[in-house]
């Protein structure tokens, strides 16, 4: 995927077979291109990850944790570039983009620290499929990938096709941090195609997924159809998040918090506010 990534903010012709990535705030602005993986390429990514597993899983957990900390250093070094990508490709605000990069750094350092303390005798599973969403294209992508890697697994990472350039750049930074070839394999393609080809592959030993409840249930069914030993699935899907407001709350602050929680990322967040409970004493002030 890295070989076919072309970063550009100019209006140039789309390369043959590539898909243009546009700024969601200005769809006439092309910020880059990517190619979708076909079935044969998807199968090859699993093969590459499987081949890299014996050496990577035998690497000392302290060394794997050290590489995560080096990746965190790379993220901080390239913070401004990653901010720009989050804004241009994912349509995030500056504030949200800053929080996104910080969260990605925190994930790397957190899993590095926890692994060093708790995974000395743990046994890795094998190849893990990580499927991440567009609304947190750096933080959730790296949260999944870093957790799987530091435990000694190799990874096939499937970012949302809408925000794949961020994932490609992250892989470049992983390479700069010293991660070996093939321990992380990137697949860029529509989710259904990836699900049909990779999820049923018996070489996949675990799946991490963040997205819709419907898709999470579909993945669970596909894994169950494989039979044999159950395949671990970590699925983070939608939720019904509520806010309870009593008479001690400042109405103007409540309104501001409700709007930001419910409508940032167009409401497309697992943590977005869905239900508001108001004490009668303050209900009229807040609603009107």
Model segments located where?
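Structural signal for hydrophobic
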Residues: 128, 152, 184, 204-207, ...
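Conserved helix-loop functional segments at active or binding sites
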Residues: 51-59, 73-77, 81-84, 88, ...
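Hydrophobic packing residues within well-ordered alpha-helices of enzyme cores
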Residues: 108, 167-170, 198, 219, ...
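Short beta->alpha connector loops at strand-helix junctions that form conserved
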Residues: 158-160, 188, 246
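A structured beta-alpha segment of the ubiquitous adenosine-cofactor-binding alpha/beta core
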Residues: 185-208
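Terminal low-complexity tails and localization/encapsulation signals of metabolic enzymes
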Residues: 1-47, 51, 58-74, 84, ...
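Conserved small-residue-rich beta-alpha loop and adjacent elements
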Residues: 24, 116-181, 252
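ALDH superfamily catalytic-core signature
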Residues: 176-178, 206, 214-288
